[in-house]
Amino acid sequence: ILIQGESGTQRRTLARAIHNFSRRHHYPFSVLHSPGSDLTEASLLRLLAETNHGTLVLSQVDRFPLSIQDLLVNVLTNVHGNFFSAPETRRFDVRIIAIADDNLYKKVEKGTFLRELFHLLSASELQTVPLRRRREDIPDLLNYFLLQFFHNTDMTCDRIFSEGLLRFLKEYAYPGNIHELYNLSC
């Protein structure tokens, strides 16, 4: 699964929800943040083994160095085979969710992202939408944040925020997306 969208659009929350509402929810949920070029095949295999039957999120995959992308292609295309660092056959059953800020297809065209890895990751694609393009969700998000702040109360944003303030919040640009709305609501 490939999840693309701007920073702050809750891509990792979406990845967690996919995991939590799947048959894999009892198994590990691991995140590999943009690694340096020193990630080894053995380290990646160890992470796959630890996450077996669960979900591995490749966070900011669009920033992975080409050497790591090549390593991922090798590991993902040999999920049921032999590896250089492990002579015995190892079998992994791991859902891979890749998260990217940028349009990966454009990076493929520029030569900064491996075409083969793009095709391996993009069997299913999801695009998160920035808050400025879904302003109608702002009252619901504010209500959700209020529930987080005031557990077990019947407070809603229309009881706390004036109509003028809600109108202002709906018109604001939100360059920080949902994170910025969350911080404003605190």
Provide a role label for each language-model segment.
Residues 50, 75, 120:
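Conserved catalytic core of Hanks-type protein kinase domains
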Residues 37-40, 77-83:
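Short gly/ser/thr-rich secondary-structure transition/capping motifs
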Residues 63-64, 104:
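Residues immediately C-terminal
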Residues 57-59, 74, 93-101:
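Structural recognition of the conserved hydrophobic beta-strand(s) that form the central parallel beta-sheet
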Residues 6, 10, 22-26, 70, ...:
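Nucleotide-binding/hydrolysis machinery
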Residues 29, 55, 81, 96-98:
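Hydrophobic/aliphatic anchor position in the core parallel beta-sheet
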Residues 20-21, 74-78:
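Post-Walker A connector loop of ABC transporter nucleotide-binding domains
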Residues 1-63, 130-135, 184-185:
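Conserved post-Walker A coupling segment in P-loop NTPases
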